[in-house]
């Protein structure tokens, strides 16, 4: 089961057997991903990559859907509807890309099509949560039309800096 996003971009459900490919993608990009994603440090062998996958696909969070991103037929990252808050009709998105796939507008194209994944829900808003120094993720959120709606100060230390968590939100298109 694939969801075609563009000629060279497709999504498929993230599954435990993706562990080796996930580990490879993380290893290629460990330095850059690790600056903003605390889980990166703990994904360092096949078992921990399986654990990373299973914790996400079995999160039990409402509306959670996790996908691997293929770019030119290589597993190049992960995209998720991390959860849906039914009371507020908000879907939180999450994503990461390996270094070799960055700069191709992949995530922006995936987000443009993400509304198709939400058609059977009552979601009215998409939410992005980005650490304040994560310029690439903030750029993606802003490019989608999202606006800064909240800041959680002193959220966590990343890249040796105590950072706030910025929350961006945009209506589903």
Regions found by a protein language model. Name each.
Residues 1-21, 25-32, 68-173:
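Acyl-donor (CoA/ACP) binding surface of acyl/acetyltransferases
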Residues 34-54:
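Conserved GNAT-fold acetyl-CoA-binding loop/helix
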Residues 40, 54-67:
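A short helix-loop-beta-strand connector motif used in the catalytic cores of GNAT acetyltransferases and
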